[in-house]
């Protein structure tokens, strides 16, 4: 019996390929001119026979030189293009060799990536359909500078990490073009860490689509050809424009009869029209980036570039944005650049080291949330985040971003006990690198999208959050006014008889109301974790609770600052928000609840129609106190002013259950003043006490109105031109 031909001795590079530790498989695999021939090497572990088919039909048999599946042969000298023909079991397959194609990243790309200034990472990193040398396929690029080996695994290679090891380029970016991989293919990255340890399969940080949880594979999607939604109306984010935001969790606004989510397209048929009818100028979505845990509400994302697949495809999400803009409603996204979860398929220990996060848990882990904190000192990380912000505005025509948990980013000792944090280089608690990141984020976003806006959820007294970077600020368009929210909710929760002792909680907010461009937020955070619903905080019997709520909402809309209401506030949701259930829309069958909805609709319309109520929301010159000292009667009065000297609106709020008649308020103009809204109207469920639509200012040295002030109510009056 003839003896088997012995395997030839192989170079060290061959064993590096076989053992999955070669950082540049192109250096060995593929076609290489050697000794007057075109040597072809292929690593196909499951193949029994392999041939190379040249561009002119010439065929070269590749010898199996190692039992692991390494094949070597030669085509005639001068051959450049070829295919591989391999036998797998009983099947013979002819296919392109991934290791014969040119690089994906250019030298200029690598320069910008290394510098951390590439503003369009989404054009280069991730998975992109492309054509190289006339062959269609997918180009994959991922950052893993400390990895020993990175492979792409997916539907196109039976999830075999031996089939498609990538090559590393400058600054630790790994790339590979896989011929005939296609849109819709599922994939992940198989990574061996710097010490040779195998990591869990990683989702693509730049994936544009993902599987529905609990599955975690990334999905190839051609985002460059995504139909871009139409733009929002011009000037929708201007400081002088009305801004009334309806904050929505897409998974629980409405649900189907079987408690299933509405899809993006089903939401597009209902939500934008509802927001427009209710008078809101903007919708703000809780984070839509892919996230593994429903209970995080999206605030622990693993896929920052992928709209969550819970509700449909990226095209479906684009259709929702387009529907909003068609209705004249702007779209804001909650954006989470402060932290991320430590799920094994995510960003944590991505290449076997702390690539995206800090290695030291005193810097890299949130004690409150058990999440990981981005390392803003790495240019690759800040580039990843800034590009993500720009991505949402460019690809999906988003009108602005609200940045979550800014305070946790600004302070190194945020929610940490003494000794559990590391000071900055000056010994302070300020996170200098995070400050630089936020300034860069705002600077680059407004440079690219000057009509957009940003808002910061910042709960401390950090100065100049919404002031320009060039003047020492963080550069945000707006800041959430958390102090106003806490003080006023505390005030309104008191029994009216005790409110005179808390009078200053209403007044205090006006001492700083114009230090920032403020949004007044009644957000999702205020209706969870035992805080009760907004209605649930109101004291008194049923009538008083709803009257208090009507007065409070009216006070909010008359107060300087842009407005934000979380879904359910407009129907006086009785219970706390539950992300696993729809809002209680059946409550609208009851007059008090439908009355609140009618009031919010009319407050929005009034806010938009009366320039004095919005044009100078963020300007001290747009506000004047008229009555601040009537604590015994719980009455406040002020004047709102527009840009035109005759644009005025008088707001009077009575936080007591008493009716006050012949109540005197000085005004700037004599003549007729129209009562344009009364929250005590029977239309809203009130007692219908008021001024029969108008009142005349008594002329004198100072014009004066003598008014009937309804109980637990607010009235708005404007001078008749």
From Swiss-Prot:
Domain of life from the UniProt record: Bacteria
GO terms under biological process: glycogen biosynthetic process
Catalytic activity from the UniProt record: Transfers a segment of a (1->4)-alpha-D-glucan chain to a primary hydroxy group in a similar glucan chain
Keywords: Carbohydrate metabolism, Glycogen biosynthesis, Glycogen metabolism, Glycosyltransferase, Transferase
Subunit structure: Monomer.
UniProt record similarity statement: Belongs to the glycosyl hydrolase 13 family. GlgB subfamily.
NCBIfam families xref list: branching_enzym, PRK05402.1, PRK12313.1
Protein name (database record): 1,4-alpha-glucan branching enzyme GlgB
Organism name: Bradyrhizobium diazoefficiens (strain JCM 10833 / BCRC 13528 / IAM 13628 / NBRC 14792 / USDA 110)
């Amino acid at each position: 019996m003839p003896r088997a031909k012995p395997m030839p001795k192989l170079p060290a590079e061959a064993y590096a390929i076989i053992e999955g530790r070669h950082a540049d498989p192109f250096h060995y695999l593929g076609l290489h001119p050697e000794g007057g021939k075109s040597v072809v090497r292929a690593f196909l572990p499951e193949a029994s026979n392999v041939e190379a088919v040249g561009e002119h039909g010439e065929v070269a048999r590749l010898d199996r030189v190692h039992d692991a599946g390494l094949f070597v042969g030669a085509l005639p000298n001068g051959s450049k293009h070829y295919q591989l023909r391999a036998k797998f079991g009983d099947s013979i397959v002819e296919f392109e060799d991934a290791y014969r194609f040119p690089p994906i990243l250019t030298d200029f790309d690598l320069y910008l990536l290394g510098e951390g200034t590439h503003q369009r990472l989404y054009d280069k990193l991730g998975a992109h359909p492309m054509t190289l040398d006339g062959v269609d396929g997918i180009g994959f690029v991922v950052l893993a500078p400390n990895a020993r080996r990175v492979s792409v695994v997916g539907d196109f290679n039976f999830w075999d990490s031996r089939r498609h090891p990538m090559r590393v380029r400058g600054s630790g970016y790994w790339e590979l073009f896989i011929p005939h991989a296609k849109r819709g293919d599922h994939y992940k990255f198989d990574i061996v860490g710097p010490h040779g340890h195998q990591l869990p399969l990683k989702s693509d940080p730049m994936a544009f689509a993902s599987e529905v949880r609990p599955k975690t594979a990334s999905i190839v999607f051609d985002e460059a050809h995504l139909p871009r939604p139409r733009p929002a109306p011009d000037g929708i984010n201007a400081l002088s424009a009305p801004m009334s935001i309806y904050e929505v969790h897409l998974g629980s606004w409405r649900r189907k009869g079987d408690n299933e989510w509405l899809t993006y397209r089903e939401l597009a048929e209902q939500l934008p029209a509802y927001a427009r009818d209710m008078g809101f100028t903007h919708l703000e979505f809780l984070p839509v980036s892919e996230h593994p845990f429903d209970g995080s509400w999206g605030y622990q994302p693993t896929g920052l570039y992928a709209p969550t697949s819970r509700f449909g495809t990226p095209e479906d999400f684009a259709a929702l944005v387009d529907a909003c803009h068609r209705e004249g409603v702007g779209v804001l996204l909650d954006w989470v650049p402060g932290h991320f979860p430590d799920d094994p398929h995510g960003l944590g220990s991505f290449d076997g080291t702390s690539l995206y996060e800090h290695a030291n848990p005193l810097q890299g882990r949130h004690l409150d949330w058990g999440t990981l904190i981005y390392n803003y000192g790495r240019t690759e990380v800040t580039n990843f985040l800034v590009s993500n912000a720009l991505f949402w505005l460019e690809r999906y025509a988003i009108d602005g971003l609200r940045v979550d948990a800014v305070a946790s980013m600004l302070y190194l000792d945020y929610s940490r006990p003494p000794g559990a944090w590391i000071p900055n280089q000056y010994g302070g608690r300020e996170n200098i690198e995070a400050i630089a990141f936020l300034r860069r984020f705002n600077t680059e976003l407004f440079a690219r999208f000057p009509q957009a806006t940003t808002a910061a959820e910042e709960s401390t007294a950090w100065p100049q959050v919404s002031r320009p970077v060039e003047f020492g600020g963080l550069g945000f368009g707006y800041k959430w006014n958390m102090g106003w929210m806490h003080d006023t909710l505390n005030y309104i929760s008191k029994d009216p008889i005790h409110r005179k002792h808390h009078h200053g909680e209403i007044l205090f907010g006006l001492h700083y109301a114009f230090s920032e461009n403020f949004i007044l937020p009644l957000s999702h955070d205020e209706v969870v974790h035992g805080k009760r619903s907004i209605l649930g905080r109101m004291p008194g019997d049923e009538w008083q609770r709803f009257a208090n709520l009507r007065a409070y909402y009216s006070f909010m809309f008359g107060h300087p600052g842009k407005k934000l209401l979380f879904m359910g506030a407009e129907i006086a949701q009785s219970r706390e928000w539950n992300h696993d259930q729809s809002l209680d829309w059946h409550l609208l069958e009851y007059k008090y609840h439908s009355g609140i909805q009618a009031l919010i609709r009319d407050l929005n319309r009034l806010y938009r129609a009366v320039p004095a109520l919005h044009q100078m929301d963020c300007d001290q010159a747009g506000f004047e106190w008229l009555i601040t000292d009537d604590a015994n009667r719980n009455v406040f009065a002020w004047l709102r002013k527009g840009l035109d000297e005759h644009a005025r609106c008088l707001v009077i709020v009575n936080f007591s259950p008493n009716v006050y008649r012949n109540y005197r308020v000085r005004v700037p103009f004599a003549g007729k003043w129209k009562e344009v809204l009364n929250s005590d109207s029977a239309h809203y469920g009130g007692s219908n006490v008021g001024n029969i639509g108008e009142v005349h200012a008594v002329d004198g040295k100072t014009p004066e109105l003598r008014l009937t002030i309804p109980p637990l109510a607010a009235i708005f009056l404007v001078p008749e031109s």
